[in-house]
Every structure is written in C-alpha cells, then in structure tokens.
Regions:
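Alpha-helical scaffold segments in soluble metabolic enzymes
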Residues: 7, 11-14, 18-21, 58, ...
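Peripheral docking tails and interdomain loops at the edges
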Residues: 290-341
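Internal, active-site/partner-interface "lid" segment
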Residues: 7, 158-194, 319-341
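Cofactor-/ligand-binding subdomain signature composed of acidic, glycine-rich
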Residues: 1-34, 38-41, 140-143, 149-172
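A general structural motif
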Residues: 180-188, 228-238, 253-254
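Cofactor-pocket helix-loop regions in the catalytic cores of large enzyme subunits
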Residues: 20, 24-34, 48-49, 173-206
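Glycine-rich phosphate-binding loops that contact phosphosugars or nucleotide phosphates
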Residues: 42-176, 207, 245-294, 328, ...
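Anionic-ligand anchoring segments at beta-strand to alpha-helix junctions in alpha/beta enzyme folds, i.e.
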Residues: 21, 28, 39-88, 198-246, ...
Length: 341
C-alpha cells in the first residue's frame, strides 16, 4: 500500500459517515464565507487535474444553470502565467500537492487565489491567500474514494451558495441517501463484474453534468482494474467515438439521450450498463442500475459510488490487486513542505 493512504475498502467502509461529517463542516464554512461576502462577484474558475478536475464538472454545470459564468480547466493545459481576469481561481487538489495546480495558483494575483483541498496545511493551501475550503484532512485511499466524493460535495455546496444562492437542503440528507443506495445496489452492481472479464476496454459516457462521473469512472478503472478506459460526454460520443464499439463494456450515465444510446449499443450486440433515474427494462445486454433523481452535484456523488462498487468487483474478477499501482511519477506532486512555502 502507498505510504500516507489507507486501503481502498477501508476508505469505502466508512465513506458514508465521513461524507456526512464533511458535508456538515463544509456547509458551515461556506455559509460563513457567504455571510462575509467572500462568495460574490464573477463566477469561479476551478483548476485541477485527474479526479480533482472531474469533481468540478457537476458544480460548474450548476453554476452555469444559474446564469453564472464558471469553468473547470485542466491545470497542466495552459501556458503560465495564467491570464489575468476578474474571476477568482480555485485550485482543486485533494492532496494539496498537485504540481500543475500549484503552478497555476502561483502565477495568479494573490487576491484571486483560492483553494479546495483535503489536506491542510499543504502547499496549495498555503499559496491560496484569498481563502481555503478544507475538507478536513480525511484519510483516503490512493485510488481516491472519500477524497473524491467530499471534493464534489465541497464544490457543489460552494456552487449552490455562490453570489447569493441557497445551499440545497438535500445536502443534509445525502449521507443517509448514500448509505441506503450503497446497501441496496451493492449486490446488483457487483453481479455485473463478469461483463468485464474479457473486456479489452471500457467506455464511460455521461450527459452534461455527468461528464465528470464518466471521467472519474474511467480513471478509477484504469487505476484499480487496469482496463484501458475513456470518459466523455454523450454528445461527443455520438460524433464518431461510438463507431469503434466492440470488445468492451459501455457504462452510460444519464436520463435522456443516454437511454437511446444504451439501447442502440445493446441492440448492436454490445454490453451496456446504464446508470439512470429513469425506469428502463433490462435486456440480455442492457443492464440498468437505478439511482435517485438528485441535483447535479449530489447525483454525481451517487454515480461515482456505483463505479466504486463496480470497479472493486471487476478487479477481483480480473485478478488485479487494488492497492498495487504500476507507475509512480516523481514530478506530479510537490513535497508537503516546499522551500519558500
């Protein structure tokens, strides 16, 4: 097991409880920041990488749905210094040590530097002179579980409250919903693992706010089950990508066009798992997994729960040890204490 992390199943075992505690802390912190006027003005730009970038998808969707311009950007995909603008820049990093995210924040006007991190103190928290929203240094697995779900919660609550918005009451019930869904769906979802036994790849496809769920799911399948996987939006998938279907499994998140995509793929002889709130009849190749209808960020947390359950079972079927990572890159994380920080 990688130093500084707990086992995947250990993190999952206490996830519902830890998520509930984090939501309570985050709601209080965001409410206080809003009362101080710190969450007003132009919409936030969230920069992150990997799972942290995926976590910002549904919250950005929620902000745009309220008419607030907001973006999520890959921290390593832009020349530095980051262009000056009126929008606050939030570095999103569960460890607080992502090198690319730190580099972006370092290049931004100090008054516009903010962070959403799990670990405080950390280098990213230190340079975020505008403000830090901390998750509470929650113990997490190397292939992130509670760190990811709590990050989505933090960003979702922040999005709700931005510029005079109201934090959705459903957040106070989400941990209980999470636990109930986990109990109900675990046997059903684990039973789908044999679909991946001989799969050469996996496609994860999501409707607009669920693109982050598709991306995070593909990352988990690469990390935990070592299956080449890709996450993308439904609309992108329709523009040519689904033409290479064959030999893999298709996991689709959504309630509208996604139903037709799932039926089309299954009708053409491909294995499909459809994560949806709509009632869908199962077929020989179409396997619906029903989840509650929730606001975008809350729904994203339930969607990734389905993936967490599924990928662990798939790793078992394929004989992959969850805790064993193949590559450890030395330049993607900075030291916990770096010179000058």
């Amino acid at each position: 097991m990688t130093d500084g992390y707990i086992a995947y199943e250990a993190a999952r075992a206490t996830q519902a409880q830890a998520l509930g505690a984090a939501i309570t802390r985050l709601t209080g912190a965001v409410t206080a920041s809003a009362a101080e006027g710190a969450l007003s003005g132009p919409g936030p730009v969230f920069v992150g990488i990997g799972a942290s970038l995926a976590a910002a998808c549904a919250p950005v969707w929620a902000l745009r749905g309220r008419g607030i311009h907001s973006w999520r950007l890959g921290a390593g995909d832009h020349p530095l210094p980051f262009p000056a603008a009126a929008h606050p820049v939030f570095g999103v990093s569960q460890s607080g040590r992502s090198a690319e995210t730190l580099a972006v924040l370092d290049s931004v006007d100090p008054a516009r530097r903010f962070a959403v991190v799990n670990v405080v103190p950390s280098p990213i928290a230190t340079v975020a002179t505008g403000g830090v929203l901390g998750l509470g240094s929650i113990p997490d697995s190397y292939a992130s579980t509670i760190g990811y779900t709590a990050t989505v919660a933090a960003l979702g609550i922040l999005a709700d409250a931005w510029d005079g918005g109201r934090i959705d009451e459903g957040w106070s019930r989400l941990a209980a919903v999470f636990a109930a869904v986990e109990s109900e769906l675990t046997p059903r979802v684990r039973a789908l693992a044999p679909l991946f036994e001989g799969a050469t790849h996996a496609d994860f496809v999501g409707t607009g706010p669920a693109v982050g769920s598709a991306e995070a799911s593909a990352l988990l399948f690469r990390e935990v089950a070592r299956i080449p996987s890709t996450g993308m939006s439904t609309r992108q998938y329709l523009h040519g990508s689904m033409e290479s279907a064959g030999g893999g499994v298709h996991v689709i998140f959504g309630d509208t066009r996604e139903l037709d995509v799932a039926e089309t793929l299954a009708g053409a002889g491909h294995r499909v798992i459809l994560v949806t709130s709509e009632p869908v009849a199962a077929g020989p190749l179409l396997h619906p997994v029903t989840v509650p209808r929730l606001p975008a960020a809350q729904r994203a947390i339930i969607e990734i729960l389905v993936t967490q359950i599924l990928v662990a079972a798939v790793a078992e079927v394929r004989g992959v040890e969850v805790e064993e990572f193949v590559f450890h890159n030395s330049d993607i994380k900075v030291a916990a204490e770096r010179p000058g920080v």
